[in-house]
């Protein structure tokens, strides 16, 4: 689903009062996000139902902390096949708003993924550099299959050649926060996704 511009200005009744003046506009409402997650869950379930029945193993969803935690939780509930969770924490060197693609593992997986059907679940793919590194790293561990699902994708900023099987929304190259996405550990608690006023991070 393609989003061309911010969908609405902030209104007084929204949770923007948590951060007065910081949110420039709403890009995706909570209702839009949940509706799209339901569609993604159905699509993923259709793709993995037969695999799950054949292998007798649950779909393993791997998420990089912390941004995609809300998304992976809601997505798992929307997928009509059994799922399991694994988490990694990585540090990507670069500025506060962009990645260099140079990655250091802070927390690795707690289990072997050899022979498993793995779905990487991302919050947003912007440069694609960190995702490219993660895909190579996990592929080297010999999973049975490896696919990627992201809630948000910024096509104009993708420099790495990474195939993404499931995309929630294609969005502009705005700096966005909310629904798990942060700036300086703030704004994750918003139920919607909004664009951050540039004065906050400039």
Curated annotation (Swiss-Prot):
Cofactor or coenzyme needed: Mg(2+)
Keyword Magnesium: yes
One MF term in the entry's GO annotations: magnesium ion binding
Single GO biological process annotation from the record: GMP salvage
CDD domains: PRTases_typeI (cd06223)
Keyword set, alphabetical order: Cytoplasm, Glycosyltransferase, Magnesium, Metal-binding, Nucleotide-binding, Purine salvage, Transferase
Active site per database record: 126
Entries under Gene3D superfamilies matching the protein: 3.40.50.2020
Reactions the enzyme catalyzes: IMP + diphosphate = hypoxanthine + 5-phospho-alpha-D-ribose 1-diphosphate; GMP + diphosphate = guanine + 5-phospho-alpha-D-ribose 1-diphosphate
Pfam families with a match to the protein in the record: Pribosyltran
Protein name: Hypoxanthine-guanine phosphoribosyltransferase
Organism: Mycobacterium tuberculosis (strain CDC 1551 / Oshkosh)
Originating gene: hpt
